């Protein structure tokens, strides 16, 4: 049985918790607080102590005269029935007689069910209840018929019979109709376990047949005292001490209950054998006509009030003396107990289930049996122990009635348990098991994202990663390798969604599609070819475009090299027909690999410029590979044929090795020898471009759809804001359109062509500069025109969040527990923090990638804190101050206040206009941050010829310098027979004759003092050396 707590016992005894704790200490039992639990033997001992004391507990019930009616209490009194107190019997439903008409005779004689043998009564003093609410004034006692003679208990002061009940006390709960009065006239027996005076019921056998063997006996409750073995509670005497009503079907010695006007008897309810019933006023009861409200109440039910289940008996016959008119039971309800009608069952409800009796507290309509019968309304019905059985506690304590036995598990429960048993466990953490399913995750996803896909707890995944040697948090972006490792442990397959595919899914969620021409074949019109000029640096790409456009762009480029992507549209005559060609100029420096790749992806034809005097160079091969990867046709322009040493034939032979075979050699690649500086053969090159486009490409687009294209370059203009150079690939872009470019969006405020002229619209294959974006987009980002600004904003924000996660996952280094020592020693690793600002996004990207590729050793590292397009601002200086960063301005300068702030705070701001100068200086700074490396340089050796002992200085070695020289305050080691005897010694004293000297050269003699080291012998060798800094490579 469950242990009870101190405050529960205090509530049962009707005293404060500190009184119970004090009594426990008197008994030698120590408890910590009122919430402490105590064992059953201690409960019995405590109950006996309160019974003997009498003052603190509830006194034994005694007859009381009727008192004047008192106001009805609003709540059940806490001093009512409990499981182990000697309060009035919980089963007694006695109440003051109500004013009623003359009693009616019961409709029929109810044959009584056989009763179970009552246990031996045990008498003893029991505590009396606390002050009870005064009952209503009792009316004149009705006339009763004399019952058959029965022997009365010798020590029973009240005439009300009270038989011991087989079960324990039943819990009481306030009934909805109000509490019934508890006062004089309620005690039906003073001592617990005392038999009824009426003896055996009429018509009932002496012993109940078929009692359940092995059932709990009344005296088995460990929370009752030894003197209360019968479990019967004392009851208050009935009003005016009158005899118990009896009649046909009633209890022995009592007549029928007087009936009220409403058809309900006003007399006290009869007591049935089988245990105590809830205390008066503790069980709620729907208020009916003629039944007055009952004052008083009881404590809330607790586990100590659980009744025992007695032996089952036969179901009582229907139609006993109920509370209905004429004593008959209600329709469908069982009869009352013999000796007085109980509360009969409601319509549709089963009868009461007390042993040998009819309706107890009956179930609601449609419910099961009453209190102790079949499962009735929750809170009333007991355990469905069958008719005549004492129910469990499910109904009594607000739980739905149901079988006590363990229900059969459903298939779903069994399957879940089986899957839990089969789930993988890593380090004691249970994980869901996959069946090889493919989980799609974006790059830079966190463990929380992964857990949502597989319905797992993110904290479990963090614990598993710790067991696998990886330290990550639940919301931290993790690398692809980490996700694959974790998924493999749970039998899942992780598919990292590429940025292109993720972007396509994002657009599809807004019913947008990029890269497809809308409409039918009739809507497609011919568009100009897009040609990208590629090649090695200084091979003449920009000069060629100048010659075609008849301009001088190269004069404006710093250092004479192109560091931006330029897009131009040129109208030329080919075969007496004017044709437009769009040219894209890409940088040739090795730092602009990504820029060249973007140019190749957005083009139709690639012109590979190769200098005739240099031949094929590294960036030539790289540009060639980009063009092949983009699957675009290539036209080779052999430039600088007019310079000394030019050999176009050599160039053709070199390119043959890379799969470009000239037409004159039987291939399909067109080679054109030109001189951009002199303007030679430019027309032939343009003709070759047009012929290649017409022969191998279908250049058509739909000009009436919403514009789509690619951002070639972008920058932050001081007067215009964000300016993006875009190439329209399909559709027509107009001023006023809402467009989203990467993570930037906005409404097109103005458009400029390559000559700086305002244009109202741009068709397919037209490069324009767009003004009106919220921020500077990245080079190579796709743009698309949408209908609403809200859609553009949502797409841009989601793209920005995705890029942040991917960048964080890229920057985050995997830290394993094995490498934790190295990480904790991170102070030894020097970091060069950089803030990069440039004039164009492509240049900033190229500079960042080139700097991050610098590798000068593991002791130093580069960390780019921030990169952006535009001038150096005060916020950049603030960031540099907080992180000791160097600000790099690439083709931009610091604004007025930002420059003053940088000078005042000592922030290092460096300006560059050529990319390779920036790379060289940053590399030199990294090498300067390296810790110096030292190497050992041998100075000389000295042979000990004599050992001189000095009380002041110790042993002094008289030596002959064999090689090199010996200097004072240098390091030395002592060798004996070729073995090192001592390391890291210091030459503390050096003398030649009696003079202190700083060095002794080869062939001279002298004296050497090695400080505190005195273990020197003749013929030992002293080798001296010094540590010199080694230059870093």
UniProtKB/Swiss-Prot annotation:
This is Translation initiation factor IF-2. Residues 675-677 are annotated as: G5. One of its GO terms (cellular component) is cytoplasm. One of its GO terms (molecular function) is GTP binding. Signal peptide: none annotated. Coiled coil: none annotated. Belongs to the TRAFAC class translation factor GTPase superfamily. Classic translation factor GTPase family. IF-2 subfamily. Residues 405-414 have a biased composition (Basic residues).
């Amino acid at each position: 049985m469950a242990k009870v707590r101190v405050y529960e016992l205090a509530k049962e005894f009707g005293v404060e918790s500190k009184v119970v704790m004090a009594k426990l200490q008197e008994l030698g039992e120590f408890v910590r607080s009122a919430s402490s639990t105590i064992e059953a033997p201690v409960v019995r001992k405590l109950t006996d102590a309160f019974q003997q004391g009498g003052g603190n507990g509830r006194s034994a019930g005694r007859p009381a005269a009727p008192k004047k009616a008192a106001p009805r209490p609003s709540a059940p009194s806490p001093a009512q029935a409990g499981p182990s107190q000697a309060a009035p019997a919980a089963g007694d439903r006695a109440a003051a007689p109500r004013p009623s008409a003359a009693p009616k005779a019961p409709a029929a004689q109810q044959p009584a069910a056989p009763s179970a043998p009552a246990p031996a009564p045990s008498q003893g003093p029991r505590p009396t209840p606390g002050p009870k609410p005064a009952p209503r004034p009792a009316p004149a006692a009705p006339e009763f018929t004399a019952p058959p003679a029965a022997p009365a208990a010798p020590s029973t002061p009240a005439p009300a019979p009270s038989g011991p009940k087989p079960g324990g006390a039943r819990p009481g709960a306030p009934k909805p109709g109000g509490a019934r009065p508890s006062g004089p006239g309620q005690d039906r027996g003073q001592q617990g376990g005392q038999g009824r005076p009426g003896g055996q019921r009429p018509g009932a056998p002496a012993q109940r047949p078929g009692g359940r063997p092995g059932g709990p006996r009344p005296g088995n409750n460990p929370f009752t005292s030894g003197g209360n073995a019968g479990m019967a509670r004392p009851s208050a005497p009935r009003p005016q001490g009158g005899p118990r009503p009896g009649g046909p079907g009633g209890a022995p010695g009592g007549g029928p209950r007087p009936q009220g006007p409403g058809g309900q008897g006003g007399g006290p309810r009869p007591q049935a054998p089988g245990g105590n019933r809830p205390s008066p006023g503790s069980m709620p009861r729907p208020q009916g006509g003629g039944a007055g409200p009952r004052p008083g109440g009881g404590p809330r039910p607790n586990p100590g009030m659980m009744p025992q289940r007695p032996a089952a008996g036969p179901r009582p016959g229907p139609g006993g003396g109920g509370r209905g008119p004429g004593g008959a039971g209600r329709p469908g309800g069982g009869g009352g107990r013999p000796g007085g009608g109980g509360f009969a069952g409601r319509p549709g409800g089963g009868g009461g289930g007390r042993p040998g009796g009819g309706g107890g507290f009956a179930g609601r309509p449609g419910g099961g049996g009453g209190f102790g019968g079949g499962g009735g309304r929750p809170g009333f019905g007991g355990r469905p122990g069958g008719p005549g059985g004492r129910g469990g506690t499910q109904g009594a304590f607000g739980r739905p009635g149901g079988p006590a036995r363990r229900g059969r598990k459903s298939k779903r429960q069994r399957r879940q348990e089986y899957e839990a048993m089969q789930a993988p466990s890593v380090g004691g953490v249970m994980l869901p098991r996959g069946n090889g399913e493919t989980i799609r995750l974006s790059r830079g996803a966190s463990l929380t994202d992964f857990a949502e896909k597989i319905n797992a707890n993110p904290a479990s995944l963090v614990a598993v990663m710790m067991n696998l040697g990886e330290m990550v948090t639940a919301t931290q972006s993790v690398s692809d390798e980490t996700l694959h490792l974790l998924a493999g442990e749970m039998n899942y397959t992780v598919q990292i969604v590429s940025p292109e595919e993720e972007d396509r899914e994002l657009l599809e969620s807004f019913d947008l599609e990029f890269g497809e021409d809308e409409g039918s074949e009739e809507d497609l019109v011919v568009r100009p070819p897009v040609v990208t000029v590629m090649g090695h640096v200084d091979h003449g790409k920009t000069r060629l475009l100048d010659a075609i456009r008849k301009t001088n762009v190269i004069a404006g480029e710093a250092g004479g090299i192109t560091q931006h992507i330029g897009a131009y549209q040129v109208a030329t005559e080919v075969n007496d027909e004017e044709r437009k060609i769009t040219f894209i100029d890409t940088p040739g420096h090795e730092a602009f690999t990504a820029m060249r790749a973007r140019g190749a992806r957005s083009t139709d034809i690639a012109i590979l410029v190769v200098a005739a005097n240099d031949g094929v160079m590294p960036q030539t091969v790289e540009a060639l590979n980009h063009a092949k990867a983009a699957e675009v046709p290539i036209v080779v322009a052999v430039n600088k044929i007019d310079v000394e040493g030019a050999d176009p034939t050599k160039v053709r032979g070199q390119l043959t090795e890379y799969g470009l075979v000239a037409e004159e050699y039987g291939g399909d690649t067109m080679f054109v020898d030109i001189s951009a500086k002199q303007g030679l053969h430019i027309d032939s090159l343009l003709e070759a471009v047009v012929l290649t486009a017409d022969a191998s490409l279908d250049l058509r687009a739909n000009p009436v759809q919403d514009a789509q294209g690619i951002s070639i370059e972008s920058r932050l203009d001081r007067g215009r804001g964000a300016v993006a150079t875009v190439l329209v690939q399909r559709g027509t872009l107009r001023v006023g359109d809402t467009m989203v470019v990467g993570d930037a969006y906005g409404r097109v405020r103005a458009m400029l062509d390559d000559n700086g002229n305002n244009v109202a619209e741009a068709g397919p294959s037209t490069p324009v500069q767009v003004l009106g974006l919220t921020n500077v987009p990245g080079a190579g980002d796709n743009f698309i025109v949408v209908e609403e600004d809200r859609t553009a904003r949502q797409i841009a924000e989601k793209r920005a969040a995705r890029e942040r996660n991917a960048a964080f996952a890229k920057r985050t280094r995997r830290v394993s527990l094995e490498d934790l020592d190295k990480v904790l020693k991170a102070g030894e690793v020097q970091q060069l923090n950089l803030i990069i600002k440039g004039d164009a996004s492509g240049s900033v990207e190229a500079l960042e990638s080139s700097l991050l590729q610098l590798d000068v050793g593991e002791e130093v590292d580069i960390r780019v804190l921030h990169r952006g397009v535009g001038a150096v601002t005060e916020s950049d200086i603030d960031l540099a101050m907080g992180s000791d960063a160097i600000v790099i301005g690439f083709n931009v300068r610091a604004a007025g206040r930002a420059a003053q702030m940088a000078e005042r705070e000592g922030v290092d701001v460096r300006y560059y206009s050529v990319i390779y100068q920036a790379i060289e200086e940053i590399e030199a700074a990294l090498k300067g941050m390296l810790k110096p490396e030292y190497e050992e340089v041998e100075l000389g050796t000295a042979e000990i010829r004599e050992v001189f002992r000095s009380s002041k200085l110790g042993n002094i070695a008289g030596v002959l310098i064999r090689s090199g020289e010996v200097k004072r305050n240098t390091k030395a080691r002592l060798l004996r027979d070729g073995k090192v005897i001592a390391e890291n010694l210091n030459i503390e004293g050096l003398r030649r004759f009696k003079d202190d000297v700083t060095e002794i050269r080869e062939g001279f003699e002298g004296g050497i003092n090695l400080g505190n080291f005195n273990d020197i012998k003749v013929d030992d060798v002293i080798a001296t050396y010094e540590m010199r800094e080694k230059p870093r490579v």
